[in-house]
Amino acid sequence: MTCAQVIRQFYQATIMTATAQQLQFIKDSIKTIPDYPKPGILFRDVTSLLENPLAYAASIELLVERFREAGVTKVVGTEARGFLFGAPVALALGVGFVPVRKPGKLPRATLSESYELEYGTDKLEIHTDAISAGDKVLVVDDLLATGGTIEATAKLIRRLGGEVTDAAFIINLPDLGGEARLNTLGIECYSLVNFSGH
């Protein structure tokens, strides 16, 4: 039995289908921290979900079940919390996991893409040999806010010849417009829970 089969068997024994009760359990496991990192912000702390093994397992299983028959050939996770959800999803799907990182963190030849922040710009990088032409790529991250990080990630994948039509998140903040932004780029967004506000 492969590692992916063992993980799948464990998940199936623990959590079977996406129900309103399961999704509420996941949402309830995410703590809200007011006025962090600055006044007026309600910070959604996904690390509290990671501390609860049942909530963490449920979130992974629900993402896996959503994309099990989608023909995904690679899962890409964005630094850093995208790794925590993307890698187990890739393992359960039986496909490779590709990290997208900040500059200077990947050892082989890389491709980079700049993106806008609230007060400037930043860059993301991917190994040039991590995606092959025709790969069907699922992008996974913990949270969707404005969509800038995922847009840059999708551009990197597409520049390498990969196809990105789906992105998956634990949390969506719809008031910040990220889902609409990604939809205009041909990327369908799937999120387990939504929170209003910033």
From Swiss-Prot:
Its EC number is 2.4.2.7. It comes from the Bacteria. GO terms for cellular component: cytosol. Belongs to the purine/pyrimidine phosphoribosyltransferase family. This is Adenine phosphoribosyltransferase. GO terms for molecular function: adenine phosphoribosyltransferase activity. It is found in: Cytoplasm. It is an enzyme of class 2 (transferase). Its main location: cytoplasm. Keywords: Cytoplasm, Glycosyltransferase, Purine salvage, Transferase. It catalyses: AMP + diphosphate = 5-phospho-alpha-D-ribose 1-diphosphate + adenine. SUPFAM superfamilies: PRTase-like. Catalyzes a salvage reaction resulting in the formation of AMP, that is energically less costly than de novo synthesis. Pathway: Purine metabolism; AMP biosynthesis via salvage pathway; AMP from adenine: step 1/1. Homodimer. InterPro entries: Ade_phspho_trans, Adenine_PRTase, PRibTrfase_dom, PRTase-like. Coiled coil: none annotated. One of its GO terms (biological process) is adenine salvage. Gene3D superfamilies: 3.40.50.2020.
